[in-house]
């Protein structure tokens, strides 16, 4: 099987290099002009890759090794327990915003703002200004409680199901936000987009069962649309205002409260990584 992975297009002709899925160079157009080229020496760069805990892990530097359990520490047990290999990709959307990529990640790292900013959307579902926090190296886990968690008060602990009654937010340092949302999984892969004041993110939704029926598709479409509306109409306008304030130079620094440990940890990890 061949796969087109690189192409250069000009008004008067098209040049397309063909590579195997393995990365080996398969063919060169007008190969007579490259008669001395050894195709075996001009394949794509090989990167370390591993499938573990239902996820695909890639290191962007050739020659390095991957040890997921060592890197993720105790969070590996969480990933294994989620049985992610049973989940199914439903949809991915790409968003752009006029703010630094770290502000996108910040959006998920405190519940301080829920009762005010998300009064009609998330506040009826999740408790505001209440969350647990755990760090594992530069990575982190923050768990917000759903209002339904009160139903566990009289249940034996053996019957507790935390996933059903919480939103479990992980940051796989530095730029992946991973959220277990009761009945589905969200991932946010966030990147700079040209300069420090712009960002691009790929938002994916995964479901525990394939969405094959029309009712299932309507249900997951509603979930995805609610997610998009919440971040684009509530979170991002505020965050983009924060970005404008940063750019104006009116503040030399910002202060995180004791009720925002995930934010403090994330920015401390960024600072340590770039020293």
What residues fall within each predicted segment?
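Rieske [2Fe-2S] iron-sulfur-binding domain
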Residues: 1, 6-62, 66-77
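C-terminal catalytic domain of Rieske-type non-heme iron oxygenases
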Residues: 48-51, 55-275
